[in-house]
């Protein structure tokens, strides 16, 4: 997501303390409606095993940027919380301290920047689990990506448990936009994702149709397999 990665750090410093003082943390309710277990992950926030029907709530401070929530599949962890996941693995830890390994469907957000939240669903790291990302108290739109992407995934992007974004596999500017703003556009492979999930980012500079805003103070709900 281009905005969240490029939001100036000095602006974060200027506005962060002010909004921490006047705005409460946002609550994110994470719900697993899949028929299988999902190991939810959040940065910031950590991680939690969610069996079918279970939920987990986290509070995120205002001023937080470059944040994301995702689901991991087919995980095995020992009693100390060390192990691995087939998709979305975060350095073999149950309690994530960084981002997950593609492919993983992402709910991304930046809070109070400076007078609105920026939110999106991103497939820039690929797709593994259907997702809905919505406000719990109104004021902005629900975002969904629920198409059967894993089943329809192009052969060159298909991987165990998910569907890679072309940037993960091909790693050129055409797909990764590594040469800066305006250096890339949609491709046939990114259009595969966009046609099935029009709300979601399909490549790194897919900003205008994919980045949404909500009022500051909004609480959110992320649902796996809505």
UniProtKB/Swiss-Prot annotation:
This protein's name: Pathogenesis-related protein R minor form
Gene Ontology CC entries for this record: vacuole
Pfam families cross-referenced by the UniProt entry: Thaumatin
GO process annotations (BP): defense response
Miscellaneous comment text of the record: PR proteins are acid-soluble, protease-resistant proteins which accumulate in the intercellular spaces of many plants as a result of the hypersensitive reaction to a pathogen. PR-R exists as two isoforms in tobacco, a major and a minor form.
UniProt similarity note: Belongs to the thaumatin family.
Tagged with keyword Kinase: no
Protein's cellular compartments: Vacuole
Signal peptide: 1-25
Disulphide-bridged cysteine pairs: 34-225, 75-85, 90-96, 140-214, 145-197, 153-163, 167-176, 177-184
